[in-house]
C-alpha cells in the first residue's frame, strides 16, 4: 500500500497545448518497466505543459523524502527441490514438468532456446544428486498426435546443455515408456513425448495423471509458464506423488513476482503498457494496492486520455472502458499512488512501419492521426520518476515496438532499467513483449529477474491462485530472504 505521504495526484494532461491549467489525474499503477523504444503505441509530448513537469518534480521530491520503510523480499512458502536432501534424491525417479515450449522454424530448428536453458539448473541439480530424471513438457497446441509438435527436435540442444545424451521416448505413458524408465541410470534423463498429444492432459483427467505419476517417486514442477493451468502434468500428478515440490525456476518466479512485489524495497514503481486496458485491468488494480508510482504506456493510454475529455484522433480507444479508466484514476488518487501518463506522444498517419510521424503533446492529437509511441518528454519524466525507486516491475511495451520508428520509448525504458539494475535497484521484467524488448536492446542479462511466464505472470500479479503452484507441498516454514 502506498503511504499517506503520497496522497496527492500528479498533474494530468493539459486541455490544449497552450493551456495554463491542468486536470488532476489520479495515479494509476504499472507493473513492469519498459526499457526499449516504445514501439507499440504512441503518446503525446509534455513539452507544451510546464505545469505538468513542475508538478511531477514536486511529487518526486516528496517520494525521495518519504519515510516509508524499506522492506525485504519474502519467498513463497512452497517446498523447493533445493530443500530435498541428497538421500531423498539419490536413485529416485523424479518426474520433472518443465516448460520446453520453444519456437521452431519450418525446418524444425529451435529459434530461441531460452526456455530450455531456464530448465537446466533444476535438471542438473537432480542429475548431480543421482536422481533419475523423467522430463515432461508440451509444445504448441496439438490436436492429438501431430508430428510437427514432437519434442524430438529438442533432444540435441538438451543433450548439449546437460552434457549427456538425453534419451527420447515416443510416448509419455505406456509399456515402452515404463521399460525405458526402468533402465534409466542414476543421473540419466529421459524425455517423454509431448503430453498434449493426449486430450486428457488439458482436461486434467485423473486416470491420465495417475499413469504419469506411476512412472516416478516424486514430482518437481519447474514449468512456471503453465502453472496457471490445472492440467494433468501440472496439477493432477501432485495427487499421486509426494513430495511434490517447486523447481528452481518456478521458485525464483514466485520469489520475485510474489515476494518482491508484495513486500518490495521502496519506493516501488510499476510500468504497465500494452494495447488494451481490458487486458491489464486485474494487474493495474492489484498493483494499485502495492506500488508508489504507476507509469502507463502503450495503446491503453488513449482510453485514459479520452476519459479525461481529450481528443485522441484515430488512436486505439476502448469506448466501453472509459468509465473504468476514470475509476482507476480515482482509485490511484485515493490510494496515494502517483500515476503518470505520457505527456507527449509520437503519432502516425497510418499503422505501418513507414508511416509519417511527428511528436505532439498528448492534448493535441489531430484527427486522422494515431498515437504509436510515447514521446521524448515522457521518457525523461518517466526516467526521473524511476530514479527515485528501489524496485521496478515492467509489463507491456510503451508503443508499437514491432516498428522501429515507434520503438524508441520502449527501448529507452529498457535501457533505463538496465542502468538502475546496475545501481542496485531490483528490476523485474514480466513476460511477453517486455522480455522481447530487453532482449532486443541487449540488456536482458543485467535485469534482476526476467519472467518466463506470459499468462501465468499476469495472473500471479493480479493476485490469482495458480493451480500448478497451490498443488505443491508447503515449505516447512516461511523463509525470509
From Swiss-Prot:
In its keyword annotation, does this UniProt entry include Transport?
Answer: no
According to UniProt, the reaction catalysed is: (2R)-3-phosphoglycerate + ATP = (2R)-3-phospho-glyceroyl phosphate + ADP
Name the PROSITE patterns on file: PGLYCERATE_KINASE (PS00111)
Which SUPFAM superfamilies is this protein grouped with?
Phosphoglycerate kinase
Q: List positions binding AMP.
A: 276, 280, 299, 371, 402
State the similarity comment: Belongs to the phosphoglycerate kinase family.
**How does this protein assemble?**
Monomer.
Mind telling me what this protein is named?
Answer: Phosphoglycerate kinase, chloroplastic
Q: Output the lineage of the source organism.
A: Eukaryota, Viridiplantae, Streptophyta, Embryophyta, Tracheophyta
